Amino acid sequence: MPGMLRNLIENTFLVVGALFPIVNPIGNTPIFLSLTKGLSGHGRAVLARMIALNGLVLILTSIFIGTHILAFFGISLPVVQVGGGLVVISTGWGLLRHSDDDDASDEDKQKECHEADYSKQAFYPLTLPLTVGPGSISVAITVGANRQEGSEWRWTLIAGMILGSLVIAASIYLSYRFAERIGRTLGDSAMNVIIRISSFILVCIGVQILWNGLSTLLRTVLPR
């Protein structure tokens, strides 16, 4: 039993340690606030729950059947990184060019939205690529591909990966659920600066993901 418990904890921390820095829900909070201006606290709570559930499904799918999905469509991981990197760059660039006048206009429009309309943006862009983007998916697929198929504690491996994914989903929910409180604490001016910086970092992350995939593809065609 001690061996099983230790193996369970190790697998849980493997998933959390690999994914949390990339998912970075706390760092994404300012961008989440920017994209949901005008929504009520209840609306953000609904969105936070939906994004956390969407993220959980994406992570678990990537871990357990991600390699099989890519193989079925004949897609390599570097190609996913190139395509995903372009999407992340586009999202970050759009946020970076978002003016304060646009924010005010969006806020007026979003105040008129019914809560049922929140689901339209819950998956794209709030879950994918903002929260669980191509970088997170690539890491999750890699973690799943490297799992030990013949492990003595097979159930602890599966349970640990599920628990680790649940921890990531919970961190997403809590960060986004209390995003408005964080925004009030920092103030509008500070949040605006943080949003711009976060958007620029998002563009840089997209470029890095794109380059990781592109450099891998180039090595297969260029002479050494």
Segments predicted by a language model, with ranges:
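Transmembrane helix exit motif
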Residues: 87-110, 205-216
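Membrane helix-loop-helix hairpins that form the core translocation module of multi-pass transporters
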Residues: 45-99
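Small-residue-enriched transmembrane helix starts and helix-helix packing motifs
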Residues: 1-21, 105, 109-127
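A small-residue-rich subset of transmembrane alpha-helices
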Residues: 41-67, 147-183
